[in-house]
């Protein structure tokens, strides 16, 4: 089974898969921001949270120690995080789509040409740019009441207070940077140029097919 990718293209497909999985996994994991509330550790992503306060029987706040997403899109603490959720999700979807096509190119001949590889690299650049934009928007939501309660009531936009950034935030940003800088460059050398003989064969095959169809139509 021949591949439609060069040796560089095979490495590009592998790296594309790694960056897409890293960014997408980080997007879904609620470990972008770490803080504490009522003596319990709390962590956030853009649309998920681990450990949250609820009213107990005595109207006292108690911490529920579990992870989950917000009940609705409108329940996400800030407009910045809502935008971050949409933008980052779109970027991850684009990177996953390109990575899937790149992996298929390792197994299928004539799937990815030199020009197609460059177009896929451009799509990776856009996907990485979207995820990077989401990472840049994320600090704009640190002034929401929910985040401030977790960060010692001293957090603000681009000010963490007592909180700290989590590994998932760095992983998402790193995956986006690798997709934009490395994968986009490697994609320029990923696809194979079609062989002239194969081009001639395809042209002749198509010409014969059209001739047979025309002959069939002209017969009474």
Curated annotation (Swiss-Prot):
Record: glycosylation sites: 153
Q: Which residues form the signal peptide?
A: 1-23
Q: How does it sit in the membrane?
A: Multi-pass membrane protein
Keyword Transmembrane in record? yes
Entries under Pfam families matching the protein: L_HMGIC_fpl
Q: List UniProt keywords, sorted A-Z.
A: Glycoprotein, Membrane, Signal, Transmembrane, Transmembrane helix
Q: Please give the start and end residues of each transmembrane region.
A: 86-106, 122-142, 165-185
Example GO CC term: the record gives:
membrane
Q: Which InterPro entries does the record match to this protein?
A: LHFPL (IPR019372)
Protein name as annotated: LHFPL tetraspan subfamily member 1 protein
- Which species does the entry assign this protein to? Rattus norvegicus
